[in-house]
C-alpha cells in the first residue's frame, strides 16, 4: 500500500489569537514554528491547493504562513517522516523502509540514525521549546519501552503526546504515550484526532512567555481506518 503524506502548513506566526493574547511573540530571528502533518492526504485535497473540499481554516493558515511548493515524498510514510525531521534523504537517516524490523544494513535500520540531529534537536539548541503531538512512526516497533528507543522526548522534544506508530484505531490507538509514560486507559468518548489537537493546544497554553516555540502536530487522519467520532455517527 502506498502512503501519502501532506505537509499542511508551516506557520511562522503567533499561533492563534488566544495564544497571542497570553504569550508575547518572540524576537523576529526566532519566530514561533508550527508544522502540521496529515497522513494519507494528497496536497490537492485542500482548497488552498485547488481541491474541491472547502477547508477555510487550513486555507487561513496557508495564507498567513508558508506553503511548500516542493517536498520529497518517498511513497511510504516512515521514510517521508524521517526525511522531514532530519532534512536528509531517508536512507541517510537509516529509514529506507518501515519501522517493523532492523535489517542490519546501511539505510535500513528501522529508526532515525543517532548520527543525524532532528529538527527538534537543532531548534532546542537554538533556545526553542519543542513540542510534539501525534503520530511518530520513526522508531523500531521492537524498541517500544526499551532503553534504546528513539522516542520524541529522546530526539529533541520537550513534551510529547501521541502514538509511536500508526495507532490502528481512532477510538483506542496503541501504544499512546505522554512523554515516556504509556497510556492504557481511555475515556468512553475518546477520539484520537481530537486528543492530538487538544494536547497541542494544552502545550501551547503552558508555553512560557518570550520563549520561541516549535510545535510539530502529526495527525493520523485521514489514514485508514475510516472511523468518525461516535457523536457524528449517531447524529
Briefly describe each language-model feature range.
Residues 1-2, 214:
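Universal eukaryotic N-terminal targeting presequences
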Residues 2-19:
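Gram-negative bacterial Sec-dependent N-terminal signal peptides
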Residues 14-235:
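Formylglycine-dependent sulfatase
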Amino acid at each position: 500500500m502506498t502512503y501519502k503524506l501532506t505537509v499542511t502548513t508551516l506557520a511562522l506566526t503567533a499561533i492563534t489569537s488566544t495564544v497571542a493574547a497570553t504569550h508575547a511573540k518572540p524576537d523576529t530571528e526566532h519566530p514561533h514554528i508550527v508544522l502540521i502533518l496529515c497522513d494519507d492526504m494528497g496536497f490537492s485535497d485542500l482548497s488552498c491547493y485547488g481541491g474541491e473540499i472547502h477547508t477555510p481554516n487550513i486555507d487561513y493558515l496557508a495564507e498567513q504562513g508558508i506553503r511548500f511548493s516542493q517536498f520529497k515524498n518517498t511513497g511510504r510514510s516512515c521514510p517521508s517522516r524521517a526525511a522531514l525531521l532530519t532534512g536528509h534523504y531517508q536512507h541517510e537517516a537509516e529509514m529506507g523502509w518501515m519501522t517493523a524490523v532492523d535489517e542490519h544494513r546501511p539505510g535500513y535500520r528501522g529508526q532515525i540514525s543517532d548520527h543525524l540531529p532532528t529538527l527538534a534537536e537543532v531548534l532546542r539548541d537554538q533556545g526553542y521549546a519543542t513540542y510534539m503531538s501525534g503520530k511518530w512512526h520513526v522508531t523500531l516497533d521492537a524498541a517500544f519501552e526499551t532503553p534504546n528507543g528513539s522516542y520524541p522526548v529522546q530526539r529533541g522534544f520537550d513534551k510529547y503526546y501521541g502514538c509511536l506508530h500508526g495507532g490502528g484505531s481512532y477510538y483506542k490507538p496503541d501504544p499512546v504515550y505522554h512523554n515516556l509514560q504509556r497510556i492504557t486507559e481511555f475515556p468512553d468518548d475518546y477520539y484520537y484526532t481530537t486528543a492530538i489537537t487538544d494536547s497541542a493546544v494544552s502545550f501551547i497554553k503552558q508555553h512560557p512567555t518570550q520563549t520561541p516555540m516549535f510545535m510539530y502536530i502529526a495527525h493520523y487522519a485521514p489514514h485508514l481506518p475510516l472511523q468518525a467520532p461516535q457523536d457524528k455517527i449517531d447524529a
